[in-house]
Design a protein with these regions (language model features):
Chain A
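Amphipathic alpha-helical interaction surfaces in cytosolic regulatory modules
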Residues: 40-43, 47-96
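Short acidic-hydrophobic, aromatic-tinged amphipathic segments that line or gate anion-handling sites
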Residues: 99-109
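Short, conserved, surface-exposed binding loops centered on an aromatic residue
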Residues: 5-8, 35-39
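Catalytic cores of nucleotide-enabled group-transfer and carboxylate-activating enzymes in metabolic
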Residues: 37-40, 66, 111-116
Length: 139, 283, 139
């Protein structure tokens, strides 16, 4: 069975799915990725599916699982490079990929991850407002 | 071709003995109705090809156009009719190329002085030529159909231009009646352009669309969902009051899809979103 | 007439393991390209085939897929028959409901595949195995 390589680039993990994956390969990727997130402490994962000429419900479910598992491990996932024909087919299949962030290409994916991390910086406006609600003592 | 072996042999001989005179006369017969739209040299070459193919098929013992041994003859006829269809000749202008052989035979063969055998053979060959003519006609019709379908598709694509309005924003201004087939082409073109230009925003402007039905509304909706799966957002602009009523009456949920009155409003909206993204990043 | 790949003669893939599902996808893609299906239609058919081949393996306990190029006289198409001698499907309406699964899947394989093809026919009963025939026509 082939394994999909997981690359660390800067503070991101990049997965380029290149092969026509067997189901077992997809499951292995899910495990590998969880381990690598913990081992590297990365907070962002980009899954590039440019090379995939179909996404069926099994791969769709794998993508959703990866996104959920990553979130539990404090990492955001972005799926990038979905082909138009694949997207049209997924709509007809009825797969909504709920909870998965998507971007047109790797570059846009990186932007999206950068944005996603923003609100967690301590000086963020949202947090100030939240704290205000607990009374003047904290401000 | 509905001939006996002996007939086939005799007709092949008949066609072959005065080959040059026959093909010259045949070329004349074909050239007249085409009124110089093909050069004589070109016609002559086509007629000679056809003549050779017919004689060879008869010699090979092919008495039927569906016969394995007629493959070459069929190919010659197909090439001829496709060429004519592509060049814009009519069906009868195409068929005349084959029927010209009849005329030529009467010119070349001595009908009056001929014996009964020759007359019978001429009748038989007439049948053969009719078969060839019919086949040509059918092939021509098929080729025309194919051409028309191709042109329709090209028109469809011409009628749905996707334009890049701004860095990161493409727009598709739809004009005219949207049927299901065109809506599908639009959907694919738009999504492809998103990828090609790397634009995360698309404006679907339907100001020029007089009405939509359920299917078309569904197509637009699916386009928006597909674009989201790819990581892009669509904004729909120019929804006419009647169309808004139709959409609601049909019970189609546009949900959280951004809609704007005009293309300009939609562009402004997209630019604001792009600006917000940039600010968030540079903070 | 070399473009009529497999016209009339079915091509068979045995489905007994994970990698056979990949083989079904690849064969269907090749035949769909040869039959001149549009890219979107190819993608829809391959996706449907992937779903049904996986069901044949997972729920039917293995079986086969038979791919044939068909000609209606007006246009060409591709017909695929998935057959297994597994437990069959007792309640077909239920199995064809979006989201229904007995195997922890997304429950979109059967219902989604039906939406992705032009003709969908299913012959099954409890204890009698399952035979699904799908056809997609070139437009
Ligand atoms: N070939 C088959 N043999 C027996 N049961 C099947 C077969 N295919 C599908 N099923 C049943 O139909 C249900 C729905 O299938 P499907 O829509 O593909 O969803 P999923 O694969 O996610 O479970 C399956 O969970 C299974 O119970
Ligand atoms: Mg399934």
């Amino acid at each position: 069975m082939d394994r999909v390589p997981v690359l660390k680039i800067g503070d991101l993990l990049l997965v380029s799915i290149q092969v026509d994956m067997q189901d077992q390969t997809a499951l292995a990727l899910q495990e590998d990725l969880a381990e690598r997130i913990v081992a590297t402490g990365c907070h962002g994962v980009i899954i590039d599916i440019t090379a995939l000429d179909i996404v069926d419900s099994f791969v769709g479910r794998m993508l959703s699982s990866i996104a959920s598992i990553s979130r539990v491990l404090d990492a955001e996932t972005v799926v990038v490079g979905m082909r138009p024909a694949v997207a049209i087919t997924l709509v007809e299949l009825g797969l909504s990929l709920d909870g998965i962030r998507t971007a047109l290409n790797v570059e846009r994916g990186i932007e999206l991850l950068a944005q996603a991390r923003e609100p967690e910086t301590p000086d963020d406006l949202g947090i100030d407002l939240d704290l205000d609600r607990f009374g003047p003592a904290t401000s | 071709m509905g001939l006996t072996a002996a007939e086939g042999e005799r007709i092949a001989a008949l066609l072959d003995t005065q080959a040059d005179k026959l093909t010259a006369s045949w070329t004349d017969a074909v050239a007249a109705p085409l009124r110089g739209r093909l050069t004589r040299a070109e016609l002559q070459r086509q007629v000679q090809d056809l003549h050779r193919a017919i004689v060879e098929a008869l010699r090979a013992g092919a008495f039927d156009l569906t016969d394995e041994r007629s493959a070459d003859l069929r190919a010659t006829l197909v090439e001829l009719s496709r060429g004519r269809a592509r060049q814009g000749f009519t069906a009868s202008e195409t068929a005349v190329t084959v029927f010209g052989l009849k005329q030529a035979l009467f010119d070349v063969v001595d009908v009056r002085g001929g014996d009964a055998q020759v007359l019978a053979d001429l009748l038989a060959v007439g049948q053969v030529i009719d078969d060839l003519g019919l086949f040509t006609f059918e092939t021509y019709a098929k080729a025309r159909e194919g051409l028309i379908a191709d042109q329709a598709e090209q028109l469809l694509e011409l009628a749905t231009p996707v334009v890049k309005l701004w860095e990161g924003v493409v727009a598709i201004p739809l004009v005219g009646t949207l049927d299901s087939a065109r809506a599908q082409v639009v959907m694919e073109r738009l999504l492809e352009t998103l990828v090609e230009t790397g634009s995360p925003y698309a404006i679907i402007d339907i100001t020029g669309v007089p009405a939509v039905d359920t299917q078309v509304a569904q197509h637009i909706l699916k386009t928006v969902v597909a674009a989201r799966l790819m990581g892009a957002e669509c904004i729909i602009s120019g929804i006419r009051p009647q169309i808004a009523q139709t959409i609601v009456a049909l019970g189609i949920e546009f949900g959280d899809i951004a809609t704007k009155a005009t293309l300009a409003d939609a562009l402004r909206h997209a630019l604001r979103l792009i600006e917000a993204t940039r600010k968030a990043r540079s903070n | 007439m070399t473009t009529d790949v497999g016209l009339g003669e079915p091509q068979l893939v045995t489905i007994a393991a994970d990698e056979d599902v990949v083989r079904v996808r690849q064969l269907v893609r090749t035949v769909a390209v040869a039959a001149k299906l549009s890219l979107v239609d190819q993608t829809k058919l391959v996706t449907a085939a992937s779903e049904l081949a996986r069901n044949t393996l997972v729920y039917g306990g293995g079986g086969g897929a038979e791919v044939t190029v068909v000609d209606s006289g007006r246009r060409k198409g591709i017909r695929i028959v998935f057959a297994d001698d597994g437990p069959g499907i007792a309640d077909l309406d239920l199995a064809l409901t979006d989201g229904y699964t007995t195997g922890g899947g997304l429950g979109l394989g059967l219902s989604g595949a039906r939406r992705l093809v032009d003709e969908f026919d299913i012959d099954t009963a409890a204890g009698r195995g399952t035979r699904i025939t799908v056809t997609k026509w070139a437009r």
